[in-house]
Amino acid sequence: MNNRPFLLKPFPASAALPDLKISTNITRRFNTLIVQYNLTGPLEELVIPTLSDRPARKNNLWEETCLELFLGPDNSDHYWEFNLSPAGHWNIYHFRSYRKGIREEPAFTSLPFIVSRQEDTFQLSLEIGMDKIIPADQSLAVGVSAVIKSIYGELTCWALIHTGTEADFHRRDTFIIEL
């Protein structure tokens, strides 16, 4: 088990929210991934939807505030994208290679996670049992990111690292956590 804290950085060209801090913590315990996102700062400047009574699998969650996770097995081109809405909605996509062969991952029919909000802190916690998609002895490259929508309608892109001229969470060179 290794517990790894990280701080996400806004994409340089985006209209960053200077007082917002997005930290993450990721742990792999056997074949369970434990991920926690913490947003601190002026949350009143962000569009954070309230928790839905009926969280569901949905597409295009990144058009609003969305917390994201990318998992790629070492020595392989394929990877998974996890999208998590503060409203409780979610989706998991599998890609054969960089942005190619996208399909919803059928191994998951639900993805429960916990959200909590206080005046200046929002937290999302998730445990993913990965046995359905990845063997326990498989090493992973992981990318953690977020799309944050402001009350002014602007979307900002946050990630562990930005390696291109445009924000692109799918780039394998941004999957910098080794688990």
Language model: regions and residue ranges:
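Beta-strand secondary-structure signal
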Residues: S23, I34-N38, E68, Q123-E127, ...
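Acidic/polar low-complexity flexible segments
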Residues: N2, K58-T65, P73-Y79, A136-L179
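Beta-strand elements of well-folded, non-transmembrane domains
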Residues: I26-R28, L39-L43, P73, G88, ...
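Extracellular/luminal beta-rich ligand-recognition
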Residues: P55-T109
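Solvent-exposed loop and beta-edge segments used for protein-protein assembly and interaction
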Residues: A16-P18, T27-L33, L61-E63, S76, ...
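Short amphipathic beta-strand and strand-loop transition segments with alternating hydrophobic
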Residues: I22-R28, T109-R117
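Surface-exposed extracytoplasmic segments
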Residues: F113-M130
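Order/disorder boundary and secretion-linked terminal/linker segments
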Residues: M1-S52, K58-N60, A159-L179
